[in-house]
Amino acid sequence: MGKQNSKLRPEVLQDLREHTEFTDHELQEWYKGFLKDCPTGHLTVDEFKKIYANFFPYGDASKFAEHVFRTFDTNSDGTIDFREFIIALSVTSRGKLEQKLKWAFSMYDLDGNGYISRSEMLEIVQAIYKMVSSVMKMPEDESTPEKRTDKIFRQMDTNNDGKLSLEEFIKGAKSDPSIVRLLQCDPSSASQF
């Protein structure tokens, strides 16, 4: 039964080639793996949280996974299909810095109004701390989610209006690599964003 759908149709492959940084072979391999883990072709938030928890065994990744799921689920239907999954994976793993920052911005912008408020930033940072704080030693000025959020806003909110625009977010991250580390909660950078 699973055999009949284990290859992407040519028109789907072409669409994904145009919207990702993956080769045809990589797309086919990812698709096979996706169908193996998600035989229905759709991933629910609970399934996604279980998968995400495997990557963060020493913390509670469920809240952060919900935010990542929401950002992957671009059509807001409550599931992630292969196209949504592979496009987001391409951006987060192979995208240029600006693409990654736009993706991260959309995750932090919880209400989708085009700005990140302090409370939105705090909610994401709290979720990150729940996920990794048991295995990461934080500097004193970042020892709580509130301190980290304040630090990010001090550095990024250049017009002091209490919210971050996409432009402030990208400019702040590009001008100071430590901001990217603050956002990622990953001192070695690169991997998670």
From Swiss-Prot:
GO terms for cellular component: membrane. Gene3D superfamilies: EF-hand. InterPro entries: EF-hand-dom_pair, EF_Hand_1_Ca_BS, EF_hand_dom, Recoverin. In neuronal cells, but not as specifically as VILIP-1 or VILIP-2. Ca(2+) 2 binds at D109, D111, N113, Y115, E120. Ca(2+) 1 binds at D73, N75, D77, T79, E84. GO terms for biological process: liver development; regulation of signal transduction. It holds the Pfam family EF-hand_7. A lipid is attached at G2 (N-myristoyl glycine). May be involved in the calcium-dependent regulation of rhodopsin phosphorylation. Belongs to the recoverin family. Probably binds two or three calcium ions. This is Hippocalcin-like protein 1. The gene is Hpcal1.
